[in-house]
């Protein structure tokens, strides 16, 4: 999708501000609109009527530099992207960050022809021209919810894929697992082999891919544990297999866990944090979603 440029004809519909010193977008807006509450400013961002250098920006902590132009549309708000299984968290000329709901595939396989995050986003960007499309950078399992990033051109896709471990600084998940974790923190290392329908784990190098998961126990209650997980590698089903290795499978995981333990009717795994250096500007981008409420309830309610 091309940058959404503001035409000269429409210029009178915007209030323009020039950035004179480095600061985050929210701080800048608060200074320019002192009577507006933080909630009001976030609402303006969510309505997609804030532009930075002619690009719609919804990230409240977007880093501004001297010389940038911030524009606020006087329109009521742009028509937002709406879909029950995903939402756009951030978009610019190079990338789209989404929050995917559980149950939605990231991308089709040869055997699966259903609508996916990839096909839905392609339809969205093609509203601005049939030549536009998004490009896969990484994936989430169908039953895992959370943050994903797509590239909007092939050059950005190559940059992200070829430099993934240098560009992505933090990719974190939260899960609810069966039983109370023995350790407050630890690391799981194993070699994973993908047999299509099942990923097998070995504690020694048997020709599989070395896979490393760091974990931290947040809370134990009601026979469950709320756990944060940080991937050092990103293999297929890695977290699910590693939690099985620890003897604490993820709730709702019928493949690597217990089919009859599913109190919330879904896999209790969510990608809640994604931090990376922007592939074009080099700026550090931080995105974080709250823990799903249904996860927290499992370790809060009394039985």
Q: Where are these predicted regions, by residue range?
A:
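RNA pseudouridine synthases
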Residues: 1-187, 191-196, 294-301
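Thr-Gly-centered strand-to-loop micro-motif
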Residues: 52-53, 107-108, 151, 202-204, ...
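Edge beta-strands of extracellular beta-sandwich domains
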Residues: 83-85, 250-253
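Conserved hydrophobic positions within beta-strands
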Residues: 88, 177, 214-217, 250
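The conserved catalytic core of RNA pseudouridine synthases
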Residues: 130-161, 170, 189-190, 194-246, ...
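Short, surface-exposed loop/helix-turn segments at secondary-structure junctions
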Residues: 252-261
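Short glycine-rich, acidic/polar surface loops and turns
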Residues: 260-264, 272-273
């Amino acid at each position: 999708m091309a940058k959404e440029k503001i035409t000269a004809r429409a210029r009178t519909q915007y209030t323009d501000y020039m950035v004179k010193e480095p600061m985050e977008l929210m701080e800048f807006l608060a200074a320019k609109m002192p009577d507006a509450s933080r909630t009001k400013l976030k609402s303006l961002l969510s309505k997609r009527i804030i532009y930075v250098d002619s690009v719609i920006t919804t990230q409240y902590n977007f880093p501004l530099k001297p010389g940038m132009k911030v524009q606020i549309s006087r329109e009521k708000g742009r028509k937002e992207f709406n879909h029950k299984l995903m939402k756009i968290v951030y978009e610019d000329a190079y990338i789209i960050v989404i929050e995917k709901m559980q149950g939605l595939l990231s991308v089709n396989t040869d055997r699966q022809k259903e609508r996916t995050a990839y096909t839905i986003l392609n339809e969205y960007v093609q509203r601005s021209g049939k030549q536009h499309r998004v490009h896969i950078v990484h994936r989430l399992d169908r039953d895992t919810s959370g943050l994903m990033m797509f590239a909007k051109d092939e050059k950005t896709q190559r940059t992200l894929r070829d430099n993934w471990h240098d560009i992505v600084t933090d990719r974190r998940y939260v899960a609810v697992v069966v039983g109370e974790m023995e350790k407050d923190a630890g690391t799981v290392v194993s070699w994973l082999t993908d047999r299509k329908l099942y990923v097998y784990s070995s504690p020694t190098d048997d020709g599989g891919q070395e896979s490393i998961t760091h974990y931290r126990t947040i809370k134990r209650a009601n026979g469950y544990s709320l756990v944060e997980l940080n991937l050092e590698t990103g293999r297929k089903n890695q977290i699910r297999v590693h939690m099985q290795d620890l003897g604490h499978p993820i709730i709702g995981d019928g493949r690597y866990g217990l089919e009859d333990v599913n109190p919330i009717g879904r896999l209790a795994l969510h990608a809640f944090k994604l931090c990376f250096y922007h592939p074009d500007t080099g700026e550090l981008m931080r995105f974080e979603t709250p823990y799903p409420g249904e996860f927290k309830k499992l370790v809060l309610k009394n039985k």
